[in-house]
Design a protein with these regions (language model features):
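Short, glycine-rich nucleotide/cofactor-binding loops
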Residues: 23-26, 44-48, 118-124, 196-202
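Nucleotide donor/acceptor-binding cores
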Residues: 116-117, 142
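Conserved phosphate- and dinucleotide-binding cores of soluble alpha/beta proteins
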Residues: 2, 14, 129-130, 135-141, ...
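Gly/Ser/Thr-rich loops at beta-strand to alpha-helix junctions
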Residues: 72, 118-129, 151
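Long amphipathic alpha-helical segments
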Residues: 1-100
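Short, well-ordered loop/turn elements at secondary-structure boundaries
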Residues: 114-115, 217
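A short, well-structured juxtamembrane/interface segment
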Residues: 101-114
Length: 306
């Protein structure tokens, strides 16, 4: 049921249009950059004469931003909340925010990439990619196995980037993880959100990979920026529905040819984009705040929000 707290201020409808334009124009930036840029512009244009008035403007703009049908809406929500939390004590200049965070994470995780290791990667993560490229730049020799990552097949993008950097890479089907898991040293993935209990919300398929990794006693590492920390506590997969505005341009194809099945148009297709991985399946999280155990996430959230 709608309440007054969900009423949108039409004066800030422009933030959604601007956000979507920035995302389409700069596909390689994380959600943090346009979000911070837009909220900074809200501050510059605000006619508020008090901190409370400014906070109200920012909250109204943030409510509009959170309506964007964008598949990283959990991260977007976290960025908005953290920005408003620190707006009175943070500079409005964020020129290299994204780049600096990735460099720091790469440095902290560097010792985990040793010569000769084989790493399993799922989906496309800018932080994971930066971490791997940094290790290759240092002359480390390692190989990567990348899942196809349906339904958007983002694994192809990851594989292409790694191949362009002369990093040995192999692309596999999502269903082939259990077949190759004994050949990898550990799993490395990104996150759309890191929740209060140290679990993560990420690309669909992450949870089942973590289950396979644990069964074979393979470490499961997560690399993500701290702006993805969110005050949410999902207990199961269905709880994710309340955390996001899940959006995908089109559902996956059931088969290559209609002759392969009868009446394909009558099939009910479910193509979720995200799933929840509990903290018990995660070994460590690499963030710019440090290398954390899942149990340490709640402490960091307290520092960020309180």
């Amino acid at each position: 049921m709608a309440t007054s707290t969900t009423t949108l201020n039409k004066d800030f409808e422009w933030v959604v249009t601007k956000f979507e334009t920035m995302i389409k124009r700069e596909t390689e930036i994380s959600v943090a950059i346009p979000t911070i840029g837009i909220l900074t512009e809200v501050i510059r244009n605000s006619h508020a004469t008090t901190i409370m008035g400014l906070q109200k403007d920012l909250e109204d703009a943030a409510k509009q931003l959170k309506t964007c049908p964008f598949n990283q809406s959990i991260s977007l929500s976290s960025v908005c909340d953290l920005f408003i939390r620190f707006v009175t004590r943070t500079s409005l200049d964020f020129p290299n925010f994204d780049h600096v965070n990735r460099i720091k994470i790469s440095q902290l995780a560097d010792k985990f990439i040793r010569d000769g290791v084989t790493i399993l990667v799922h989906g496309f993560s800018r932080v994971v990619l930066a971490l791997l490229l940094n290790a290759a730049f240092q002359g480390k020799r390692f190989s990567v196995i990348v899942t196809e990552s349906r339904p958007d097949s983002s694994g192809y993008k990851t594989a292409a980037r790694l191949q362009a950097a002369n990093i040995p890479v192999k692309l596999i089907m999502d269903g082939g993880v259990s077949r190759i898991i004994d050949k990898v040293d550990y799993v490395l993935c990104g996150a759309e959100a890191i929740v209060e209990n140290g679990g993560i919300v990420n690309k669909i398929g992450t949870y089942q990979i973590s289950i396979v990794a644990k069964a074979f006693k393979k470490p499961f590492y997560v690399a993500a920026e701290s702006f993805k920390f969110t005050r949410s506590y999902p207990l199961n997969q269905s709880d994710i529905e309340s955390l996001k505005n899940e959006h995908i341009s089109e559902p996956f194809k059931v088969c290559n040819s209609c002759s392969n099945c009868e009446n394909p148009e009558q099939l009910t297709i479910d193509s979720p984009t995200l799933d929840y991985t509990p903290p018990s399946y995660i070994t460590l999280l690499f963030t710019e705040l440090g290398v954390l155990t899942p149990s340490a996430v709640s402490d960091e959230l307290i520092k960020l929000y309180y």
